[in-house]
Amino acid sequence: MHYHRYVPFGLLKSEIEGADFFFAPNGRTDPEAELRASASAFGSDRPIGALHQNAQCAFPERFRFVKQALGLQYKEVPCPILDRFLAQFGSDPGAESVTLVFSGAQQDSPATMFGHTFFRINSRKKGQSELLDQGLSYAAIAPPDDGPLIFYWLGMTGGYHGHFSTMPYYLKVNEYTLAESRDLWEYKLSLTPEQTQTLLRHAWEIESNSWMSYYFFDGNCAYALLALLEVARPDWELTPFSLYVIPGEMVKRITRIPGAVTEVTYRPSLKKKLERKIKTLSSQERDDFYGVIRGERDPLSIDSSGVLDAAGIYFLFEKQKNDGKLPADLAYRMRLVLSRRSALGGASTVAPPAEPSAEALDSAPSTRPDLGHDEIQLG
């Protein structure tokens, strides 16, 4: 229910703001009244909320808690809309665990200066690439015509509603590492399948019935995900931040919990991938690379797969910078590069999205958020 006691007056209030989230008229400030009203509502057939669901379907995690805490018995009802929501994260047997994903800042974009965090929900489908798993994000819903001043003002003052959304993970990888040249750090969390289901059911409760105000420095993506994660792992005590929390601090807070993170992987942005590839070239190969991208060397005369891979990554990077388009001359050179690279055979490093690797993990420690300096804590 996300109740917190606010200083200096000691007011107890839920951070959830939509009225449909509460059954009692004073439920946002009175947990006992809300518990009694919830226990009654779960035995009613009256549809509630924007989706006109039975209360058991609208609040599946609260329903589970009330049954266990109060020892009550109910006639349970089918929940087809909820079932469809959960099925997108994997079925038979379903979602297995959660990975916290941190994206670095986008160059020349002040709105991304603190980075961004979201979850990848890991399914248990054998043989399926993790790129086909679903991402779960929390972000402000801002009208597209809001200018920068309005955007920053409303973001600072909680003028936007924050909402959860889902998207296939490969689209998130493409968005961040290709289109925006942002590194991705992945932290697999030690959640059990049941704890993962708890997290998803609670995300459903908030998203289908209510919202939270979005603030850049506290009620942001990092805080919302911490609050969601704390429902699944209350023993981690994730949300008592003094005044603000930004994505990098969220990552550090979780990684400092013994046993919370079981694996760390890194997906470099296309720009980092290009920089790393160029560093592996010999002096002559670098001359050939620059000759190819400047149009001074015929790609069909190049015998080095490393040069062609680097040139292919460069043209792909330029294409992403220009909204997926290349000038005719660059597009022609790129086709020649890819044709020559294919003729040489062997594994190519051009095709995105890149899979994480130990080599990549060791190559970029400076961008790893959990190894960065601590922020100054206010409050």
What are these regions (language model features)?
Residues G94-S181:
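Glycine-rich catalytic cores of cysteine/serine-nucleophile enzymes that process amide/ester linkages
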Residues F151-A222, A232:
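N-terminal accessory/precursor segments of enzymes
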Residues M1-P78, Y187, H202-L378:
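Activation targets extended, charge/polar-rich intrinsically disordered C-terminal tails
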